[in-house]
């Protein structure tokens, strides 16, 4: 009974939610054996035919290449591509590739020479003697990738599995309508497929190996059972036909009952899955030593006269394959790469066959029905019932249209396998898969931008930290340099410290007084005499500077004399043209007379104290005398022209006379108390004498021109007489000085 339950559990099949049963349409192409296609004249090999980065070019334009020769180097996750035939590299340029928009990607263009010569092939028939790492490296360098549609590098996938893989699943379901490439491969090459499975099992060492195949492939099932008749390590599981049973998560659940977690991988639950075509490519790479240069492609559709499965070289233009199969295009003919549910329409037929190309569908005008217009969602939930990933396609549709990326991510849009079951059952003809693909692309772009921003932020923070460290180190160096003096500074500091210590030692020495000895104050006396000498030198220098400032400039003296003569002429002319009725203020005249007397006394004192060796310029003296005479005449004329009726306030006159006498006495006292060594500037004295003489002449002239009826003020007459006497004394003294 226990064995019965174990056997039942061993062959148990689980079922997933959702799924659809579309028309299979497989009988068009699975009835004919695999055949070869004649070589094309030109091959276009894109450098990137897999998930990941493209490899590094190792050929140049004009190089001769052989079939199987690497065109790129595979490093890390970069998968190399190989020449599909022998020929010459004519160009390395962007070319449209297998993409819904036919995006241009860098490609190697080879013109075939028709010989189809291989590179030397080194097969490992005894692969069991090779290590796991050697086998994985060979698979990777021979360009083997997942041929079921994803294109993930097989070597990287095997390396990532490690020792935690318990179940190896070979996907032979091939659930999508029209496609029969794996079915025909298992019918014609079942033994090679099983041998490739054994190589994978040798690398992974799983606990069990399962082959999942749908029950709509009876010939393939028979061939596999015949090959596995004597094997107990590989189990063949036949599952019901249901789309999409060939999905990785769906087939894993069907065969093991385990579900891949959201955002996780099948290896997280100890399961690794490979496609039938991938197992065949592994066998050819390891045992035969042949890189992947061709694959099985289904050519089907009512627009093709000879549908079937062919060995298509990678890089062969699609047009060449269709023409070889008898392609009869209609007016609005479409060609789909892949199946009707997960494939995409080609913009033109010059795109090449790549590693993930498994079918070329050329339907007639009415084979897939007329395209219908998209309508509004009616919330019928048919898409949710058909979704094999247990998602809510109608909600994802609204989130995608509304650009609500966060909500779409929260509703697990990344788990969508883009099987097209929701779009197939939608009564509103909404292309849901297209919306989901676009939303995934936008989310991926946003995440890529966030990643770049995070990297830029990390670089900025690292730079700021580096600058802070450099600044701190620089400040520390400056601080150390300031604290630690240089060698010469150390010597100077040491010398200063030595002097200080010596002085301190001298200061602490006791003063000893001996009888009969006198103290030695010579150093102090010498220092005092030096300070006195320095002070006398500074005073002498200052005195010389002051004496130099008093030296008369002969040019300046001549200029001043000329100015005085000009002023005297101008004054005489003004006096001659003066109107007789012009009145002179007697108070102002009295003040001017007193000032003139004071100046005269001061000038006499200065001339008496002047040094006899000092010479006075006679021209300058003559100028000053003329000016004095002119001023005197002007004053006399003003007094003579004064109106007789003008009365002078005796009190004001007395005050003015008292002020004049006080100023005169003060001036005489200052002159008497002056030091005998004080020297009077002879130029200034001569100028003042000339001014006095001019005033005297001016006063005389004014008195002469006065009208006879005018009365003369006796006080003014007395002032004028005093001025005249002072001027006469001054003139006599100047004459004596000039004669000396």
UniProtKB/Swiss-Prot annotation:
Pfam families: Complex1_51K (PF01512), Fer4_7 (PF12838), RnfC_N (PF13375), SLBB (PF10531). It comes from the Bacteria. It is found in: Cell inner membrane. Residues 602-621, 660-718 are annotated as: Disordered. Disulfide bonds: none annotated. GO terms for biological process: electron transport chain. The complex is composed of six subunits: RsxA, RsxB, RsxC, RsxD, RsxE and RsxG. This is Ion-translocating oxidoreductase complex subunit C. It comes from Escherichia coli O9:H4 (strain HS). The gene is rsxC.
